[in-house]
């Protein structure tokens, strides 16, 4: 019997990430033919992201998602598998979608922070993909049962705010349970006997994997205590993340990181891990020249699928958990924009750097977020880099004020 590596077959028939359903089926036929007719044994066959048939849900092209638009879409297209979990502080519905009949029970939620929409997009994109590729759905959801909470914080999501309508950060409210929305989630979790949880978030543009490449995706196996003990629950989480990383690193090289695992005693993921539920934290981050996060959205969607796939395969195993530590850790190295060598209009010689971050907001009547440049640091910023840098040497600083003010909009020009 001859032996052939599955990766060789992938290389023969896969040359792009946007492979179609017909090519996926062709791959399966080639593999079956190799096994049955040519007496070849295929090693390590699985569906890799290389041939994942990604497509964006056409109903949600913008980064901003209106709660009302989401609710209407779910009610119109998925009424048979959604139920109202409860309502928000301002009375907006919060929907739970139930998919699959497998034995492995998974709970996931999106937009606990209202200004983090990538996870909602990822689930909406997966629904569109499953519609066109039912074989992916059937394979996955024969093994797992998923409860997905869409837009846990609809009040904050409507205003594009991190916090809820009462200005509570739900991800720091586990012990007090002051927020109505978090109580709904925790009641479901505490009575649901879940095997895994997916805590889906986004991170700022400041993070990289190596000081150069953006941390487009970061994952975390949260700690249970200040000592960061490697408990069995954490090892199960690490095993899932390791398997995800192994499958994603080739399509997103040098842009996947490991989030810091310091213990946060009031946060959701840390306490759910403490409860014995392996909880995978997702953080969608920056993608070069992509502040609308369209690229991040694509890889977030694939990562969500790969997380569910890994869970279905591991089923509580801690296999290869130790390789989690090989994933590069997030580094805080960048600003959105840095003006270098700015000479101010002062009575004395003053040359400095000005660092800028974009503030995201949804303006009344708009259906997409806007970006406002805000001064976040002034002085020597030589230890940091900018995704965009402007050298102002030999140029004029033009402003009504003599110097830029921290935490205010950029109100100057460089000419």
Predicted regions and their residues:
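Conserved beta-strand scaffold positions in the cores of enzyme catalytic domains, especially
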Residues: 82, 96, 148, 197, ...
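Short glycine- and acidic-rich boundary segments immediately preceding or forming the N-terminal edge
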Residues: 44-94
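C-terminal accessory segments enriched in acidic
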Residues: 41-64, 192, 220-415
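Aromatic (phenylalanine/tyrosine) cluster motif
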Residues: 2, 33, 45-46
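Short beta-strand-to-loop junctions in surface cap/lid or active-site-entrance loops
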Residues: 96-103
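Active-site/substrate-binding loop(s) of hydrolase catalytic cores
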Residues: 103-107, 112, 117-254
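Short Gly/Ser/Thr- and charged-rich N-terminal loops/segments
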Residues: 15-16, 35
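Short hydrophobic targeting helices and cationic amphipathic motifs
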Residues: 3, 7, 12, 23-26, ...
């Amino acid at each position: 019997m001859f032996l052939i590596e599955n990766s060789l077959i992938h290389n023969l028939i896969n040359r792009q990430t946007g492979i179609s359903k017909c090519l996926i089926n062709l791959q399966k036929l080639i593999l079956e033919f190799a096994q049955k007719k040519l007496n070849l044994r295929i090693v390590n066959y699985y569906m890799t992201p290389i041939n994942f048939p990604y497509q964006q849900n056409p109903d949600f092209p913008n980064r901003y998602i209106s709660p009302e638009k989401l609710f209407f879409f779910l009610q119109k297209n998925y009424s048979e598998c959604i139920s109202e979990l409860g309502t928000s502080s301002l009375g907006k519905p919060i929907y739970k979608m139930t998919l699959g009949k497998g034995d492995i029970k998974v709970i996931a939620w999106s937009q606990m922070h209202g200004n983090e929409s990538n996870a909602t997009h990822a689930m909406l994109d997966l629904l569109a993909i499953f519609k066109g590729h039912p074989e992916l759905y059937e394979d996955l959801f024969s093994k797992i049962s998923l409860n997905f909470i869409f837009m846990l914080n609809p009040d904050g999501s409507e205003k594009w705010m991190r916090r809820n309508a009462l200005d509570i950060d739900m991800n720091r409210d586990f012990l007090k349970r002051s927020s109505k929305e978090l109580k709904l989630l925790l009641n479901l979790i505490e009575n649901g006997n879940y095997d895994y949880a997916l805590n889906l978030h986004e991170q700022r543009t400041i993070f990289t994997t190596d000081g150069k490449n953006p941390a487009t995706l970061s994952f975390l196996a949260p700690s249970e205590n200040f000592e960061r003990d490697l408990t069995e629950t954490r090892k199960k989480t690490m095993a899932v993340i390791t398997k995800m990383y192994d499958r994603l690193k080739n399509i997103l090289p040098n842009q996947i990181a490991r989030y810091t695992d310091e213990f946060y005693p009031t946060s959701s993921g840390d306490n759910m891990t403490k409860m014995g539920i392996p909880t995978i934290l997702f953080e969608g981050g920056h993608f070069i020249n992509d502040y609308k996060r369209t690229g991040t959205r694509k890889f977030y969607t694939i990562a969500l699928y790969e997380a569910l796939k890994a869970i279905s395969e591991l089923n509580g195993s801690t296999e290869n958990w130790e390789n989690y530590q090989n994933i590069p850790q997030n580094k805080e190295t960048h600003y959105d924009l840095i003006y270098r060598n700015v000479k101010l209009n002062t009575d004395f010689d003053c040359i400095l750097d000005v660092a800028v971050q974009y503030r995201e907001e949804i303006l009344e009547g708009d259906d997409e977020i806007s970006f406002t440049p805000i001064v976040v640091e002034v002085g020597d910023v030589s230890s940091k880099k900018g995704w965009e840098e402007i050298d102002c040497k030999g140029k004029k600083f033009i402003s009504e004020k003599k110097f830029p003010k921290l935490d205010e909009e950029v109100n100057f020009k460089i000419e």
